[in-house]
Amino acid sequence: MTAELAIYEKFIDAGIPHYCGADSFALNGAFCGYGVDYAKLGVETADMVIEVLQGADPATTPIKTFDNGIVTVNTETAEALGIDYSGFAEKCTSVVETVTAEEFE
């Protein structure tokens, strides 16, 4: 993600919100990262596995999709761009706030 550290300020200077597909980009300066709610995905996957182990036919197991996920917003970048991101809350499982870091756990 070090590449993000090299470009995020250029997006801010240009007034462009940079949207990404992973939270790690927001941790490195992008406006926000949007991705799958892996906890919810894990629960749904486990439920499907239980059904199959109890005799359900995998060929007839319905496909499940998710209509929301987790958005990680870099609050420093949002402030620099003057963006109110409160509208994300009603469309996502959760909104995680972060600030720019060169390293993260």
Feature roles, as predicted:
Residues 1-105:
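Short hydrophobic alpha-helices and adjacent helix-cap/hinge residues
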